[in-house]
Every structure is written in C-alpha cells, then in structure tokens.
C-alpha cells in the first residue's frame, strides 16, 4: 500500500510510533507534530492510530484522514482506557471542520472492535464509510486497493492536486 500511495504523489511516512504497544495519546499526538503533519497531510490510522488521527484533527488542520478499525469508546479495556484517547468527549464538529474529507473502513467480522463503534463514528462525522464483511481487524498486511482508490478520488477533488 505504501508504494501505491507514493504513486499518487504522496510523500509517505510509514514509521513505527514510539510507545507502540501502549499507544498513549500523550506520546503519539506530539509525535504526529514531530513528523510534520500540516494542512497538506493525509493521516491514515489503523486501530489506535485511527484514534490518534481523530484526536489530532480535533485541534489541527489536515487535508484528510482515513480511519481503519476505528472506535469511540475504550471498549471496557483497561489498556485502552489508560491510552488517554477516551477521557474527554469527542469533538466531532472540530474533527470534521479541520479537514476536507474523512473515510472510514471497518469490517463486520472485526474481532477487536464491534462494527457498531465504527458506524457511530461515521454517523457523527458524516463521512465516507466502507463496511467489509471479511477483513477482520485489517491485520492481514494484504494490499488495500479500496483505501488507495478512496485517497485517489479525494485528492482528485482537491484544487491544485
């Protein structure tokens, strides 16, 4: 997927984040800043990365984001609760206002995040939502042509792209 996104003219930063097991907001959100995210950035976040993309967009302008395996609650999990993403209410209007577009990909057979979570996020963001039935938690590392096509379509709608 990285190569496919680069072929769209994107400078792809695919880096393991610090604290990648606990995925704490207090570490990840400043790291997104360190990577140089700005109004021309497309954030693509999977699982905890999707939560980070949401929280980042509450207070920062980005071009757009793609959220894969997203949720809005800690799912009753102590580790998720400790991550810091779920302490404050979600500022859906700010997330939406701070970017031109948002796409969500989820699978109804995700063993970690119930599909109702992603549907809830999509309903609050009034964004593009794509629901699969057989992708689990999208951890198979296979190509993801649907995501690449979505980004391609969105970039084509941005003036000057």
Question: Model segments located where?
Answer:
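Conserved alpha/beta-hydrolase "acid-adjacent" motif
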Residues: 111-117
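Short beta-strand/loop motif that positions the catalytic acidic residue
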Residues: 98-99, 103-106, 110
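Active-site catalytic motif of lipid deacylating hydrolases and related acyltransferases
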Residues: 1-39
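Catalytic histidine-centered segment of alpha/beta-hydrolase-like enzymes
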Residues: 23, 135-148
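Catalytic histidine neighborhood in serine/cysteine hydrolases
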Residues: 11-13, 122-138
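Gly/Ala-rich beta-loop-alpha elbow adjacent to hydrolase catalytic centers
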Residues: 44-54
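Conserved alpha/beta-hydrolase fold motif
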Residues: 43-44, 104
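Active-site nucleophile loop of the alpha/beta-hydrolase fold
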Residues: 17-20, 66-75
């Amino acid at each position: 997927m990285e190569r496919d996104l680069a072929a769209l003219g994107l400078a792809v930063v695919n880096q393991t984040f610090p604290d990648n097991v606990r995925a704490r907001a207090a570490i990840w959100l400043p790291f997104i800043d360190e990577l140089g995210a700005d109004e021309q950035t497309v954030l693509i976040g999977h699982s905890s990365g999707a939560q980070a993309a949401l929280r980042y967009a509450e207070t920062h302008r980005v071009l757009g984001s793609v959220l894969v395996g997203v949720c809005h609650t800690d799912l009753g999990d102590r580790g998720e609760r400790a991550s810091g993403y779920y302490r404050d209410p979600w500022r859906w209007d700010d997330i939406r206002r701070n970017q031109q577009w948002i796409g969500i990909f989820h699978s109804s057979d995700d063993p970690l995040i119930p599909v109702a979570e992603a549907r809830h996020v999509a309903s609050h963001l009034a964004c593009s939502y794509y629901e699969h039935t057989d992708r689990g938690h999208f951890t198979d590392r296979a190509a993801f042509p649907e995501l690449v096509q979505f980004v391609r379509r969105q970039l084509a709608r941005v003036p000057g792209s």
